[in-house]
């Protein structure tokens, strides 16, 4: 499984198909939301291909949200990351055997998060209607200055729905 480029391509392909089928049903998010989400997730690809030299605010926001809400579900990440420390875990991370698999999972799951959070509407205390994705800062925290207190119950409900979608 480690360093398996074809496995990562297969994982991304099947993930894309599964995400597209989910969007076609329109139950949780639309095809338009998913297309936009893949466009945004593309900024993460540029960051990874340049070894973090090219970093956009969008890529930072997506990664921060994924990390802060513990969204990325990948068995190799869960098993491997906690046991490896030091230089290999940080500076030489791109050489890890499961790197390609983890990146494929990220590119499958990040668009689902973005699409679902964009499709979940929220009305601020001021009466402004927005979506949950736009309510987060690039640090992956709720923007209280612009949108008021975080709708914690709605965010948690959406996270649970997201976890179920990812695990399908």
PLM regions and their residue ranges:
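Hydrophobic, often aromatic-rich secondary-structure segments at membrane interfaces
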Residues: 1-168
